[in-house]
Amino acid sequence: MIIFDEKKYAEDLIKNGYKDKTRIVLDNIILVKYWKYSGLSESEIKKKLEDFMIDFKHRYNSNIIPYHIRKALNQGLRYPLVFDKVVNITQKEIDIINSIDVLELRKVLFVLLVIWKFRDKQKFMISNNNLKKLAKVKCKNSVFWDYLHRLHDLGCLKAFVYKCKPYYKLNIEECGDIVLNIKNYDDIISYYLSMIYPDEYIYCSICGIPIKQTSNRRKYCSSCWKERERELRVTINKRYYEKNKIKTV
């Protein structure tokens, strides 16, 4: 699982708690980074994390809290919180992707490229299911493995094992003019599809992310529409409250 906005992710964690017990170590590191970004001291962060873990101790063995706290502090205090990161894609990179004859392959490679550059061109891990979801590719696992093998054979993708875990790196020439600035990672593949099918896409009136045009009325992406609906509900509720308050006076 790739976390593109650690700030937003940490705020959701604080509000709703752990969602996956297999990610508690990584979640704690992000929480430490978030509280460090918020200006808290190391002792304050330690206390906050301890309280947080106690609140959700039903999700794991509570005897390991001290170990988890030490590990999270050791990692989280060393690195900055990652959010509002922009990935630039060049025309040369798009040309290389477009030289592949199968659209599904191109979609997978584009998403891999974005992740690789988001990771500052370091090796990265991602499950096939997550990669398929981000690339919006629907196929059997055997077919998807064939896609990855073909990208490897084309020289674009390098897969290797490090500490018994599979990692990826890319081999794509970066030169040329920048043609895409990716700022929103809710729908990565829409950036690429909007370039090859420009007549089918418009841009969200709020955040600017490309969105597939399904009707003449559509102006917002899903995330911005949800936020706009929330603001409208708040406004309506406020007016209703004020109206009834006047009646009772």
Write out the residue ranges for each language-model feature:
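Short, exposed beta-strand "edge-strand" segments with a Pro/Gly-rich flavor and a Y/T-containing core
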Residues: 81-86, 124, 213-220
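Modules that initiate DNA replication and primer synthesis
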Residues: 1-101, 122, 130-140, 144-190
